[in-house]
Amino acid sequence: MSDINATRLPIWGIGCNPSVGDEVTALLTSGEA
């Protein structure tokens, strides 16, 4: 269980935390641009 949770933690973190999602989006945008 702990391994599965650890693997899905980043995904759930981005989905639950708008601020984190914004940071990731900014990084992806700047990286692609």
Swiss-Prot record:
Function: Major toxin belonging to the bicyclic octapeptides amatoxins that acts by binding non-competitively to RNA polymerase II and greatly slowing the elongation of transcripts from target promoters.
Family: Belongs to the MSDIN fungal toxin family.
Protein name, UniProt field: Alpha-amanitin proprotein
Record-listed (3R,4S)-4-hydroxyisoleucine modification sites: 11
Keywords: Hydroxylation, Thioether bond, Toxin
One Pfam short name: Amanitin
Propeptide segment residues: 1-10, 19-33
Gene responsible for this protein: AMA
UniProt keyword Iron present: no
Covalent link 2'-cysteinyl-6'-hydroxytryptophan sulfoxide (Trp-Cys), residues: 12-16
Taxonomy of the source species: Eukaryota, Fungi, Dikarya, Basidiomycota, Agaricomycotina
InterPro entries for this protein: Amanitin/phalloidin (IPR027582)
Crosslink (Cyclopeptide (Ile-Pro)) position: 11-18
Domain of life: Eukaryota
